[in-house]
Amino acid sequence: MQTIYTKITDIKGNLITVEAEGARLGELAEIERVDGRSSYASVLRFDAKKVTLQVFGGTSGLSTGDRVIFLGRAMEVTYGESLIGRRLSGIGKPIDGEGECFGDPIAISTPTFNPVCRIVPRDMVRTNIPMIDMFNCLVKSQKIPIFSSSGENHNALLMRIAAQTDADIVIIGGMGLTFVDYSFFVEESKRLGFSDKCVMFIHKAVDAPVECVLIPDMALACAEKFAVDHNKNVLVLLTDMTAFADALKEIAITMDQIPANRGYPGSLYSDLALRYEKAVDIAKGGSITLISVTTMPGDDITHPVPDNTGFITEGQFYLKNNRIDPFGSLSRLKQLVIGKVTREDHGDLANSLIRLYADSRKAAERMAMGFKLSNWDKKLLAFAELFETRLMSLEVNIPLEEALDIGWKILAQSFHSEEVGIKEQLINKYWPKSCLHR
């Protein structure tokens, strides 16, 4: 039997305090208003009989005489095959105008996957973006952020990854989205043709902060069910984790918690890690690969959100000047697949290209300072132009094998074979014989 409480003692922002007994942390409650409307709330903390709840949708119109009913369960989301192709809000309600989703309710606050059932990652997730596939491979079950500078079009990059990946299902969690961003996600998913394998959980900038906090949990709970029950390889795309952290900060300030670095709660690291650690490759099952966008306010890599994220994840993609910067990017799992599930020349070729591109940057600096350029400097600058156009551009959409072939052609068009520092047996096998040296 559910107990009804009618003594709301405090209303502050999106929080209410009610005198109640037996409430549990994270428990869901229904609020029945005197005007007949109802809304949901989640227990954030309790002190003796004083229970603090975060109200979904805000407290506007709420009165101290409204009825609060604790439901005895945590927040749930509907899971089933009918979820594919749908768009849902931060509380799991459809927002695409296509009716209710049918399926089984599942809890969203579940522990990370049993480590005993995890296996060492061994497969590559293809994106057809050379700066990822060739230089910083995305590995199945990897958790990796995109550190985005101000003004970068990270949403377009996410949409390209979603459209070009070989994952079975793509789940997108959008947090703090403007209406323009939300419309872009919907239109691009249809234009690029992956809406039939995509699920979107969307929190808009005008929605309550608590709904923003729930988005990653809903996306990852559904991803885990697809991976475990249906052996699907799921790619989860979350944007923007800085908005997620800001929502945590807003809730913590409203609750009068003592702030830590730059006003963020002291639990920020744990809150981020709890979500990222859901990435998993399951023995005799599917997998969850997680890519998130973390915007850097003021391009500050030491900001608490990217700083904490870097300690949790397995590398990062650094988006700068509308390119994935090869010097700021790193995949800590790429050695598990390079040369093992990819071509034998992959590692040596990628290392040579990046080394020569780094040298070309130094040559560009010498040219900018008015130094006389050597013939080697001129070769490097010509190489850099080809490299940036044919491999670094985010508009390039080619499979890994073609990217490797293009890499060899760029080297052959710019240098003699003995100048690139690659093993002779690979040179003999892959160096284009038809290319003329310049």
Curated annotation (Swiss-Prot):
CDD domains: ATP-synt_V_A-type_beta_N, V_A-ATPase_B. The keyword Secreted does not apply. Pfam families: ATP-synt_ab, ATP-synt_ab_N, ATP-synt_VA_C. GO terms for molecular function: ATP binding; proton-transporting ATP synthase activity, rotational mechanism. Gene3D superfamilies: 3.40.50.12240. Signal peptide: none annotated. Coiled coil: none annotated. GO terms for biological process: proton motive force-driven plasma membrane ATP synthesis. The keyword Oxidoreductase does not apply. Keywords: ATP synthesis, Hydrogen ion transport, Ion transport, Transport. Belongs to the ATPase alpha/beta chains family. Produces ATP from ADP in the presence of a proton gradient across the membrane. The V-type beta chain is a regulatory subunit. This is V-type ATP synthase beta chain. It comes from Chlamydia felis (strain Fe/C-56). The lineage of its organism: Bacteria, Pseudomonadati, Chlamydiota, Chlamydiia, Chlamydiales. The gene is atpB.
